[in-house]
């Protein structure tokens, strides 16, 4: 009976909606945290991360709306553009600003803006190959032609490589200090490990799952782990042990 089938799928639907809502709230709160840091210190990488996290929140909100109310063309385009392309590249750009330095990387901001604008035009104008399914988790593979999918692949793989590589490089650099490593250095090592693990969770979730519940769950878990790593980088927290006698 259709009624019984609908009831059987209800727990999975509710779970997916809950995880998508949680991912939206966590990423939005994460963005507010980086915005607060940027307002206080005016560092370029924190502004880039703020923009990226609000883009992540927009993608999570689209996931939330799509799972809860049914997918439509505009909701899927927002989800795909912000989640698969723009937020990863902008996060990676922020990491380059931090690790390489604003002086060298800042001139490339306009390249990022131009590529982002190009991606927006492509995703918003690309014809849909088939009707957007109202249920489940639509994918670019079934709905878009080659160009939007290539943009998403390059952005996701390249951005994740920069994020994980930057975190691992920081851990190795701090680890080499040996006995000279401070409590703050150790905290930063754990923070970067958490960030790397969170990015890997997000990447694996996006690649491995095509059902809304596990995808939303890994999205929520991944951004939460990255947020935890970010909180560990707080200079006030890192400096706390040094104030003890």
Locate the predicted segments by residue:
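Extracellular-loop-to-transmembrane junctions of the mid-late helices
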Residues: 9-23, 121-169
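Hydrophobic alpha-helical transmembrane segments of multi-pass membrane proteins
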Residues: 22-33, 45-66, 193-210
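Internal transmembrane alpha-helix with an interfacial aromatic "cap," most often the third helix
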Residues: 28-38, 64-72, 82-114, 241
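Alpha-helical transmembrane segments in multipass membrane proteins, preferentially the mid-helix core
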Residues: 29-33, 90-97, 149-182
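Non-cytosolic membrane-interface motifs at loop->transmembrane helix junctions
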Residues: 72-82, 138-139, 213-221
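C-terminal transmembrane-bundle signature of multipass membrane proteins
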Residues: 164-174, 186-245
